[in-house]
Design a protein with these regions (language model features):
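Membrane-interface junctions at transmembrane-helix termini in multi-pass inner-membrane proteins
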Residues: 5, 133-156
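Alpha-helical transmembrane segments of multi-pass membrane proteins
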Residues: 52-53, 100, 115-140, 226
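Interhelical loop/hinge segments that connect adjacent transmembrane helices in multipass membrane
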Residues: 1-5, 175-186, 197-242, 285-292
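Membrane-water interface segments that mark the loop-to-transmembrane alpha-helix transition
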Residues: 6-18, 45-46, 59-107, 122-125, ...
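Residue-level recognition of pore/gate-forming positions within transmembrane alpha-helices
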Residues: 15, 19, 48-51, 86, ...
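Hydrophobic alpha-helical transmembrane segments
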Residues: 125, 155-205, 265
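Helix-loop junctions and terminal segments of transmembrane helices
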Residues: 59-74, 146, 264, 268-292
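Signature of the first transmembrane helix
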Residues: 3-65, 99, 103, 130, ...
Length: 292
């Protein structure tokens, strides 16, 4: 229990450090000398849409990784562990399906957003690479939880991402990069932390990727499909709930109002920091207890 408390406090510290950096980012974003309100609203709306695409693409693989990791770890040699490979295959299938749907729906998006949020229409296709980067990180993050990497992932997604954003904001303010280049780098922020996390797991010999179907997958096939189907619906509702407000504002009013709403949401999210740190630390313990 003491280890849980210590790790939770460390994760919470990194989360609040990230919020401090995020506050600096928001200040710079909202300074009209450097960014317009519409440009700030674009970054928030683009992130919300990318999160929505990621949530729908994941098809519940994060819950699969949480629940079944002990079964794979206890019954398979590392080189035969196909859990991460299976999760990546399911997520890739979901992402291809969602990207296709997004392409088909582009005329609808243009019709809904072109009048009040033309910037979002201009950068519409940036949703795809950003959503894919977020998806990759979330899959690897869920996998890494089982190795006790909750503190590390809290640092990466709460602190390092915001520091990376701060760096590219400064580059934009200094005139080193254009706004378009800024947006291109902005879409890759989760790719950066995915690479860092993958490198750390690889260096510690914990990054096992096999695409050959194992006996554990065959044995639990029906249960795996059931948990993927159920959690896909839960994740869809959760992501839609968190994204719909700012997207409706961008569609019906403008990106400026979406930016104001995003700022209020950012302030409210500060209260969730302890909860997020507890979740990151306790997931592997609950997974092991569920199996045993």
């Amino acid at each position: 229990m003491s280890q849980i408390r210590k790790r939770t406090l460390k994760a919470t510290w990194w989360i609040y450090t990230g919020f401090l950096i995020g506050a600096i980012n928001v200040y710079l974003f909202t300074n009209l000398h450097w960014f317009s309100a519409a440009q700030y609203g674009l970054t928030t709306s683009l992130r919300e849409l990318s999160m929505l695409v990621c949530g729908l693409s994941a098809l519940g693989v994060t819950s699969f990784l949480y629940k079944f990791f002990p079964y794979y770890e206890d019954n398979l040699a590392p080189q035969k562990n196909d859990m991460l490979g299976l999760a990546l295959k399911v997520a890739l299938f979901g992402f291809i399906a969602m990207s296709s749907i997004l392409y088909i729906l582009k005329p609808l998006v243009i019709r809904k957003f072109s009048e009040n949020s033309p910037l979002l229409v201009e950068y519409f296709y940036y949703i795809i690479p950003m959503g894919f980067c977020i998806l990759l990180f979330q899959v690897l993050e869920a996998y890494s939880y089982s190795f006790g990497k909750g503190v590390l992932t809290s640092f990466l997604k709460e602190t390092l991402v915001r520091f990376y954003t701060l760096v590219i904001i400064v580059l934009k303010i200094a005139g080193i990069i254009s706004f378009r280049s800024f947006m291109q780098l902005f879409t890759l922020q989760f790719l950066v932390i995915f690479i860092v996390l993958a490198f750390i797991l690889y260096r510690e010999k914990k990054l096992w990727v096999s695409f050959a179907t194992s006996r554990v997958t065959k044995k639990f096939r029906k249960k795996i499909i059931a948990i993927l189907a159920f959690t896909s619906l839960v994740v869809f509702v959760g992501v839609l709930r968190s994204s719909i407000d700012s997207l409706v504002l961008a569609s019906k009013i403008n990106l400026e109002n979406a930016a104001f709403f995003a700022f209020a949401t950012y302030l409210a999210s500060i209260m969730q920091a302890p909860f997020r740190s507890i979740v990151a630390i306790t997931i592997p313990i609950l997974s092991r207890a569920w199996k045993d």
